[in-house]
């Protein structure tokens, strides 16, 4: 995936990237075209809101979506919606185009309506409260326990050696985030089945636009959640997750798929792994 920092070329992009490999606006903006022409059929796009007026970049983002669908028949698999946030030596208030929580929520909601098939990503730079709000509006992918500095996962980061790209507002562990999602009634999914089954590009688009992908997503979410609960979760998270799985399994509409999912969930409890539709 790749994000275009800003779609406005003159007096904006070129001012932010005057030199270096990223200074070529056309080459950077057309990265997705080159990727898809080279055989990569799933791409992700995004724009860093706050560097320019949000209306301009929002329209640029949707035009980018429209272009990819028109040219390749496949829109972006994911859309990221980062916004200017504070980091080392950076104050978000110094950017006159930084956006409020209300505008941010509106952007998320309209993208979800305009591009219903895409996965929408929000990072840990957003607070817990902000993440909760946009989950209700269309965000489908979030992270937990993230580090934003070079080598951040290798060792504990010292206070006087901070190289973070941005401050992490949501500092909860993965287990805490999963527990929170379960309390909110969501199904935390660790599924990567579409990639592993080759359901990418035009195959994915046909499935998702017809709604048939629902026959895979729900059961796969429950099975991958079950694996997480068995292998990594705290006891409290595990109990909440098992209750949700029991409830959601009964809601699988296709009887045959429900039967297979129940069988696979029992196999996971017995120690087997890696089931998928």
Residue ranges and their predicted role:
Residues 13-25, 92-100, 160-167:
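Glycine-rich tight-turn/loop motif centered on a GG-T
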Residues 12-13, 54-56, 153-154, 200-201:
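Short Asp/Glu-rich motifs
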Residues 26-90, 100-129, 136, 141, ...:
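Conserved C-terminal portion of the radical SAM core fold
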Residues 9-12, 87, 108-112, 154-158, ...:
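A short alpha-helix capping/helix-coil boundary motif
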Residues 25-27, 49, 58, 72, ...:
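Phenylalanine-focused residue identity feature
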Residues 129-140, 146-277:
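Radical SAM enzyme core and accessory elements
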Residues 2-7:
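Short, small-residue-biased leader/transition segments that mark boundaries at the very start
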